[in-house]
Amino acid sequence: MKQTKRTLKNHLAMELRAIRTLHPVNPKFFPVVTVKALLTAWLPYVTVYLSARILSELSGQRRPEVLWKWAIATVIVTGLMTLLRSFFKEREETLLDDIWGRKEILFCKKAVSMDYADADKQETQDLRAQISQNENWSGLGLMNAAIVYKDFLNGLLGVLGGVGLTVGLFLSKVPETAGSLTILNSPVFLLVFAAVLIGINLWAGALYGKIAEINNTLSRNATFGNRVSSYIFTFPNRKGTWLDARIYHQQSILSRLLKNNKTFTYDGAFGQASRGPIGIRSALALGSSAITTGFIYLFTCLKAWAGAFDVGSLTQYVGAATALANAIFCLLKTYGDLQANTEHLETTFRYLDLPNTMYQGSLTTEKRADRNYHVEFRNVSLKYPGSETWALKNVSMKFQIGKRLAIVGENGSGKTTFIKLLCRLYDPQEGEILLNGIDIRKYRYDDYMGIFSIVFQDFQLISQSLGSNVAGSIDYDPQRVKQALADAGFGPRLESLPKGLNTQLYKDYGEDGIEVSGGEAQKIAIARALYKDAPFIILDEPTAALDPMAEAEIYAKFNEISGDKTAIYISHRLSSCKFCDEILVFDRGSIIQQGTHEALLEQASGKYAQLWNAQAQYYTN
């Protein structure tokens, strides 16, 4: 991959955008970091300055009142600054942990607000995975921008403080009686000396820039290795994985996979780079810092020896020069971190900036008391992004509110695609879908979605209370939740739970949570759809974990309680078909049969009759 050349302007622009993005997450963080950086950077200089005043007085007039004044000032000022620094340091660490967790809200909001068609793309999921990988394995991304800000302030304020305390070092004159050491007064010598120090530090900055470039190259090439390691290290935490691992001895497979993944081993790419180009450049950069400090020490000692200043000033300049060298080193290293982080911030914002291209209408869906809605598909066709095959082709049909509609067909026949189009998770490339005669794209998206309750086959429950799972909110009507659970067949299980609706699902947060079976989870998901009380209820194979008889019982019960709602059933198993008003049979993206259960059975050679006869033993006495 060809690397993009970036300027200092590019790096700073990305850093500033990251700060603007993180600041609303917790507005207290950056002010606290700024105050703490000020205290951290200037405390050494204040200590050095006050100590130097005491030494100057001790080596000079030794006046007790002056010594007491400086001693008391030193204790009070340094003590107060140290106390404040400790306070703000604790605040900074607490806020840093807080902002680390809260910044995930940015990604959650983006995930649920972007077009579903984009969210469903593999490249979008890979992009999000790459962002998480960068943060979890190398610490780069949004949070590193906060660290860079903190370190940059420490370095910059340290340099400013150091320059302020060492300016006298360069302005003080060596006496003319100092012989050859009077060269230290020469403007030419001072310019050459400054140029050498600047050159050494620019060289160190270039070294850190090269280290950042190498790290970015390693990071790009380590994507697969990162994912392998992440998969293996999180494997034990996945529910049910160790059962299969024990039975089928999968440990050896995982061990071999980990052994062959040399990304982070001593002999791998990172290990070789640490011992080679990165290690060498890091050592040279550290060495340059030591050389800078040594030159300043030598210059200071020669001036003091020549009589340019007293022992107190010598202490001040040596201490300030040491702190200044450390601050310069911090600033240069931070610039390297800034360079390294830019590419990862670009990845982050590429995800956060994904545009929503789905047309957003302005019409509201009628809140009809009679729930009199009708839906029509007109010559609808869809290809999924990146596919050349039609998932749905030239589909036309109508259905009225209050009807029972079954959609059947084999895997890949287009059943779920039909539902995704109905719910406007995708827009068709051809044709149109109408609600009460109006193209659904003209309705407000949230309003339109509000008329559907859906239970998908791959539904998810969250590790929260049972009541919150059903209601989708922490505030809910307990009686309605209980009724929905009872209607879904979960009533007996609910009665056995000591905490009732407050029972925590799963044990992610503690041992007081409960594990629910696949069948129980599906009943909770169905109860969630019932609680929403939308005019359309769609069941997309949600009963796959139930046996055929239990499924038939659930569907029969669901048919009773759905009332005047439109119910759409999708299932491999056909227990729902007997009481449906109409059945659509899909095959290879098209509707090949349409009619009632009895009418379709009369077509003995038809697809529906074949599917029904293969399963009839489960539904007939």
Label each residue range with its predicted role:
Residues 434, 491-524, 533, 618-621:
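ABC-fold ATPase nucleotide-binding domain signature/coupling loops
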Residues 499-500, 556, 563, 573-621:
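C-terminal portion of ABC ATPase nucleotide-binding domains
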Residues 1-16, 97-143, 224-272, 342-355, ...:
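Extended non-transmembrane interhelical loops and adjacent amphipathic helices
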Residues 31-84, 159-212, 302, 307-311, ...:
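Transmembrane helix-loop-helix hairpins at lipid-water interfaces of multipass membrane proteins
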Residues 423:
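Helix-to-loop junction immediately C-terminal to a conserved catalytic motif
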Residues 1-43, 65-69, 88-92, 124-160, ...:
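Membrane-integrated ABC transporters
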Residues 250, 296, 315-354:
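Cytosolic ends of transmembrane helices, especially the final helix of ABC transmembrane type-1 domains
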Residues 247, 251, 352-403, 483, ...:
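Primarily ABC-family ATPase nucleotide-binding module
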